C-alpha cells in the first residue's frame, strides 16, 4: 500500500489509507505500507519532493514480492510537474514505477475534476503579493491561462495511471466520468470511532458545546477552496450555531487567516483544535446535527463521508460531486451564497427525519469492513502479473 501521507501525518488521504489498511488486515490480508518518513508505515522514502519515488517503490516491491501494489493516487502527493508549454514535460515522480512494475497495480484516485471545476481554480486568487490588490488582474490572467493549458495534461496524468493499472477505484459517479469508465466505484470508507457515549448530549458535554442549540459543523483544512469566507456572511438561522474547526495539512504551504470567522457573530464557535485524532473527530461529529460544505471546488470530500457515517446530513455548494449524493436524499446542495446556505439549514431542519433516515440506510455502505471486502474482491479478480 503506497501513500505519501500516513498517520501521524495530518491529511485526509493518510487517514483513509490507515483505516483501509487496518480493515484489510482484519480480513486476514498481509498489508505493508510505504509512505513518508514522517508516517509510521512499514517502509519510508516517498515524498512529493523526491524525484526517486519510483525507484523507492520498485526496490520495496523487489524486496517483499507482493501479489498486489495498491497506490493511493493524487498527482501532487508524489510530485507533479504540469508544463503548459510542452505537455511532454508534464509528469509525476511515480510515472516510471507504473511503466516498470510487473506486479499488478490497483490505483485509488483521490481527485479528478471536470473542465469547469478545473478552470474555477483560477478564480481563487490571493489578494496579497508584491503588487498587492493591484496585482490581482495579472495574477488571475496568469493562473487562468495556465489552468487552460494544463487541464488535458492533468487528465492525462490520471488516464495514464488508469491505463497502466489492473484496476482503478473512484469514490463517485462524478469521478468515474472524469477519470475513466474503466474504474470501479467504492465509496470512501468512514465509520465512527469505537467509543461508548450515551448520545449527542454527552458528546457536547465533553467538548463544552451548547446543549440548547442545533449545531452545524464546518471542518477541514485552512484553504481558500473550502469556502470559509461564506461563514462570515451568513445569517445563521435562529436556534442554530456553527461550529468551526480548521487545520493545516502536512504538505500545505497555504496561509489562510481564520480570525475573521468569529469577529462577526457569537453564533459561530471556533474550536481552534487543529487536526483532530480519530476519537475527538468522531466525538465532534456525534455532537452536531448537520455539516456545512461551502466549497468553491471539489472532486471528493472525506468530510462529507465522515459526517454521513455519523448519521449527519449535509448542506453543500451546488457542485457536481455533492449533487450526486444530494440526489440520494443524504443532504441538499444550494447556490454558494449566504442566503442560500441559511435557507439550506432551515430546509434540513424542516425535513430532518427524511434526511436522517436516508443517511442511516446509506452509511452501512461506508463501514470499513464493507469497503475492505470490496477491495478484496478487486484484488481477487486480478489473475496474473503484467507481461
Segments the model singles out, each with a brief description of its role:
Residues 195-209:
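A short helix/loop element that forms part of the nucleotide-sugar donor recognition site in Leloir-type
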Residues 210-226, 232-236, 243:
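Conserved donor-binding/catalytic core segment of Leloir-type glycosyltransferases
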Residues 190, 219, 241-257, 274:
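Glycosyltransferase donor-sugar binding loop
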Residues 92-100, 124-167:
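Membrane-proximal helix-turn-helix segments that form the acceptor-binding/catalytic region
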Residues 246, 255-282:
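Nucleotide-activated donor-binding/catalytic signature segment of Leloir-type glycosyltransferases, i.e.
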Residues 290, 313-316:
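Short hydrophobic beta-strand element within catalytic cores of glycosyltransferases
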Residues 328-339, 345-352:
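Conserved acidic donor-binding segment of nucleotide-sugar-dependent glycosyltransferases
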Residues 352-381:
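A charged, aromatic-enriched C-terminal amphipathic alpha-helix characteristic of glycosyltransferases
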